């Protein structure tokens, strides 16, 4: 090694003496060795961050070279989740959604452009899902007791009354004045089918704007998005989809890379009554919990899309889903049938 070191200190000295070729080779080897040493990357920093919003925990796991920058990006993304909660919450009295629910039957309510745009998207989802997705499902969720967290079996008359006070066609949007109006009294918007997915997408945009290219963002565990890949795993972020009947078992394993996953299952919120299980996944057309599925998982480019469509696919079943799902969606259906196994739609 001593001749090589001398060559690095003064390459001209080496090259003044024969054999010149040998000297040049030594010099090149030494330079290459130093280059390798200089470019050895430091292991990436891992940061985990969480914030409570929309009644659940939003979690972020991210990697990068600079801990300070990661912390700033994670805090900014968390603030975005809190901001959206204050826009869409039906528990915060001064949120935009609460104001609409209180006043939109009495008079048109002017809302922010962001809120208006999201409502327009929700109306499109309702049309495309044949009404199986309906953001006006609030009265139905209330009469079934899911707002209180426990759930109970309502009388048929209560369900009928709730159905008469909902319906996406009874929401009037005025783009020119950016207003929302309800055509029926007692209506209320419920953000449960869109809020987490929308927030996750906004958090992802914030992280990318801060230069983050490796992160996993989770909204309550049921709606997640993987940015890039974690270190040493080019396939993406490892995600286990649990078995709907047994949490200790696995229905499927996937790797998320620049895509989202959302799952709707009858094990998330439910109650027992008269010997039956009643899930929180309501069919807004009938007023009763949907049956026939245990869980549905959707992989889509946006978390808003995967979260929203998980419920119509759950409600409408395999055949409808196979006919209508976009080609860039992947759907795992776990049907509630004896001996049935979870299967990905082709």
Give names to the regions the model predicted.
Residues 2-18, 23, 27, 31-346:
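Mature catalytic core of soluble alpha/beta enzymes
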């Amino acid at each position: 090694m001593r001749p090589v070191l001398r060559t690095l200190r003064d390459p001209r000295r080496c090259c003044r003496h024969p054999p010149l070729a040998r000297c040049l080779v030594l010099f090149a080897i030494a330079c290459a060795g130093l280059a390798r040493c200089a470019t050895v990357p430091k292991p990436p920093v891992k940061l985990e961050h969480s914030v409570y919003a929309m009644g659940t925990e939003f979690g972020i796991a991210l990697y990068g070279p600079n801990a300070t920058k990661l912390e700033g990006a994670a805090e900014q993304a968390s603030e975005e989740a809190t901001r959206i909660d204050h826009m869409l919450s039906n528990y915060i009295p001064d949120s935009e959604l609460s104001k609409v629910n209180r006043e939109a039957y009495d008079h048109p309510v002017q809302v922010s452009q962001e809120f208006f745009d999201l409502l327009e998207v929700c109306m499109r989802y309702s049309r495309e899902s044949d009404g199986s997705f309906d953001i006006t499902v609030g009265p139905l969720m209330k009469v079934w007791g899911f707002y209180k967290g426990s759930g109970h079996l309502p009388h048929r008359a209560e369900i009928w009354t709730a159905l008469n006070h909902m319906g996406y066609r009874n929401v009037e949007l005025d783009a020119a004045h950016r207003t929302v109006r309800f055509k029926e009294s007692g209506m209320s918007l419920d953000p449960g089918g869109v809020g987490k997915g929308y927030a996750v997408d906004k958090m992802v945009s914030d992280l990318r704007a801060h230069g983050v290219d490796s992160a996993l963002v989770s909204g309550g565990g049921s709606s997640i998005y993987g940015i890039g890949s974690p270190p040493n795993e080019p396939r993406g972020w490892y995600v286990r989809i649990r078995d709907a009947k047994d949490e200790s078992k696995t229905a499927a394993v996937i790797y998320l890379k620049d895509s989202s996953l959302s799952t709707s299952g009858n094990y998330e919120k439910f109650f027992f009554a008269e010997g039956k299980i009643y899930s929180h996944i309501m069919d807004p057309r009938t007023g009763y919990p949907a049956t026939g599925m245990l869980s549905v998982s959707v992989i889509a480019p946006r978390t808003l899309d995967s979260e929203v469509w998980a419920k119509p696919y759950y409600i409408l079943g395999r055949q409808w889903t196979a006919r209508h799902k976009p080609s860039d969606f992947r759907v795992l259906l776990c049907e509630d049938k004896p001996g049935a196994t979870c299967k990905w739609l082709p």
